[in-house]
A protein has these predicted regions:
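Radical SAM [4Fe-4S] cluster-binding motif and immediate context
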Residues: 116-272
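Conserved C-terminal portion of the radical SAM core fold
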Residues: 15, 163, 168-180, 202, ...
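Residues at alpha-helix caps and immediate loop-helix transition turns in enzyme cores, especially N-
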Residues: 25-29, 55, 71, 158, ...
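Acidic, low-complexity intrinsically disordered segments
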Residues: 1-167, 171
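Radical SAM enzyme core and accessory elements
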Residues: 12, 360-517
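Short helix-capping segments at alpha-helix termini
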Residues: 34-39, 61, 87, 200-208, ...
Length: 517
């Protein structure tokens, strides 16, 4: 119990970091702390209270102070003032970012390099988890939907410090080191030096298998960066590239500077390298984007072939221009976190529901990697664009109640829904779905909806085992199935997933030739 653990230490002050995902629970917890220890100071910080400190203080009497903005310098100054029995509002020099009732300060933006946050207790708990690393703060952009541009101009920390932290985190047992620099390649020299350092030490001082995640601006990538990324071992790098929209009017309205032509070209180039997991983002609910234009952005993004296309929904964050300038950005949004858009002049609530259902279908079929071939075949055979396909599939899933059903049940639902589309050959549909299931499910077992009793399968398994070129590896599980649309046998040995796609390698042999080899 978090409250019990806090009170067990009999604290004189309790400080909370507040984010979208924890603000409601944090305020309840703060009230409980104040009720149990009325003399203890309750202090909040973090992005969810930095731009609305006066409102939070007015609505929450249990909160004594808010530290707005960066806190590395202000936290120790506040604690020193409280420990000395002095009023923090009267501290000299002033405590940056300090907010109290009747005393508000602008969010603190530090110019110097922050101290290392990597205490031994943090490092000891990283095994099998994600470690977070920043080598810069601030953002060169000022997107109206985002807070990053409110955090000051970009400031890059010393490279030697970044290199030390990379080695420390990579050796901690974490499976991923995620750079939280808002635009990692905004300073190409800094970014390239870090990439080169990782590549130089990967597999030596940096254990093989550790993955490094970067958020990039795709349209400003330089040739030197491409050359470094191309050298990365498969699965060593993950790239996240925010597109948000391909509608030029929308991008201009939200003050997002993007060369969409260069962006598309560069994403295709990164995907074609085949050694990195590429994640791209779209946001639904932005200005001037209706269902038709959003569909165009979706189809454009889907065609780029990234391993993940995330369909997110606009959130009206405290401090973001889209929340603070409602006349310019009119929309209805939830008053509760995460403040998600409910209606815009261009999208009705019903249309947003269509997109949410499409997002669910996209996650299950494409982003999961589970039904890539199934979706590709169904779209091509039925003549549907990706956007229409996922909107219709999502709507059918919502009607069917697929939200929490097991994978085998969803497979059956997907098969039956796709089979009813015009132009679908059921044998070819089954082939695609069998390949998907074998490539992503290491049991090698097919669900009942794809199961066919055929004596030929047993003969094929035996024949594969007899041929040295296709014999199974000792002690390795194998999956085998017949493909009736193409008259092939498909088999897979579950040894190692592709580190980029997360799928196992499939092998096929012609049924007609199998018994003559």
């Amino acid at each position: 119990d978090v409250l019990a653990r806090i009170l067990d230490g009999e604290p004189d002050a309790v400080l909370f970091s507040c984010y979208l995902w924890n603000i409601r629970e944090t305020l309840r917890l703060a009230a409980a702390v104040k009720a149990a220890r009325p003399g203890a100071y309750v202090v909040l910080g973090g992005p969810e209270v930095s731009y609305n400190a006066g409102e939070v203080l007015a609505e929450n009497p249990q909160v004594d102070y808010i530290l707005s903005g960066e806190g590395e310098r202000s936290v120790p100054m506040l604690l020193a003032s409280l420990a000395a029995g002095r009023k923090p509002e009267e501290a000299a020099p002033p405590i940056p970012g300090l907010c109290a009732r009747g005393f508000l300060s602008a969010p603190c933006v530090e110019e110097g390099t922050p101290p290392s946050p990597y205490a031994p207790a943090y490092l000891e708990n990283l095994r099998g988890r994600i470690a977070y690393l920043e080598t810069s703060r601030g953002c060169p952009y000022a997107c109206a939907f985002c807070l990053s541009g409110r955090c000051g101009k970009p400031r890059w920390f010393p490279l030697e410090q970044a290199k030390r932290n990379i080695l420390t985190l990579a050796r901690s047992g974490a499976h991923t080191v995620k750079f939280i620099d808002r635009t990692f390649n905004a300073n190409p020299a800094h970014a390239n030096a870090i990439l080169a350092f990782i590549l130089k030490h990967y597999g030596r001082d940096i254990p093989a298998g550790v993955c490094f995640h970067f958020e990039l601006a795709g349209d400003i990538l330089r040739e030197e960066t491409f050359a470094l990324l191309e050298q990365a071992p498969p699965g060593a790098f993950q790239l996240e590239i925010g597109m948000q929209s391909f509608c030029e009017k929308t991008l201009a309205a939200v003050r997002r500077k993007t060369d969409t032509g260069v962006l598309k070209q560069n994403i295709r180039r990164l995907v074609a390298m085949g050694n990195m997991h590429v994640h791209i983002d779209l946001i639904a609910g932005l200005p001037h984007e209706d269902l038709r234009t959003f569909g165009e952005s979706f189809n454009t993004g889907y065609a780029l072939g990234a391993q993940m296309l995330q369909l997110g929904f606009l959130k009206l964050l405290h401090g973001a221009a889209m929340r603070e300038e409602p006349e310019e950005f009119p929309c209805v949004f939830s008053e509760d976190p995460p403040y998600e858009v409910q209606k815009t002049p261009w999208l009705s609530p019903e249309e947003l529901d269509v997109l949410r259902a499409a997002e669910d279908a996209l996650e299950r079929c494409y982003n999961s990697g589970r039904f890539l071939e199934t979706a590709a075949y169904a779209m091509a055979a039925a003549g549907l664009s990706p956007f229409v396909f996922y909107c219709r599939l999502g709507a059918a899933g919502a009607r069917h109640g697929t939200a929490n059903i097991p994978l085998d049940d969803y497979t059956a639902f997907l098969y039956n829904w796709c089979a009813a589309l015009p132009g679908i050959d059921k044998a070819c549909l089954r082939d695609a779905m069998v390949r998907d299931r074998l490539a992503t499910n290491s049991t090698g077992r097919l669900p009942q909806c794809l199961h066919v009793t055929d004596a030929l399968l047993g003969r094929a398994v035996k024949r594969l085992a007899q041929n040295p070129a296709t014999a199974p590896l000792p002690g390795v599980r194998r999956g085998v199935a017949l493909l009736y649309g193409t008259r092939q046998v498909v088999f897979v040995d579950y040894t190692q997933k592709n580190p980029v796609t997360g799928r196992y390698l499939l092998h096929t042999r012609s049924i007609d030739n199998l018994f003559t080899e």
